[in-house]
């Protein structure tokens, strides 16, 4: 089962990096992203610090607020492909 734990930690790290990167690309503060998404600012911060286990519905909300897709939030290549 250790492999599953490592994979899970990788996904949390990728999500954290991508949420922060897409937020910056969209010139949004955590407060602005919170307002757009309906999530609390501290929740956004905890996602970016890899402290949250995000639900599928929250992933969808974040993807819409960041003008991207759930798969792009969960892959290292998602952001690179969009930047060209």
Curated annotation (Swiss-Prot):
Keywords: DNA-binding, Transcription, Transcription regulation
Protein name in UniProt: Control protein C.SmaI
Every HTH cro/C1-type domain range: 19-73
Top-level taxon in the UniProt lineage: Bacteria
GO cellular component, one term: cytosol
This protein's record includes keyword Transcription regulation: yes
GO molecular function, one term: DNA binding
Protein task: May control expression of its associated restriction-modification system SmaI.
InterPro entries in alphabetical order: Bact_TransReg_Diox, Cro/C1-type_HTH, Lambda_DNA-bd_dom_sf
Pfam families documented for this protein: HTH_3
Residues annotated to bind DNA: 30-49
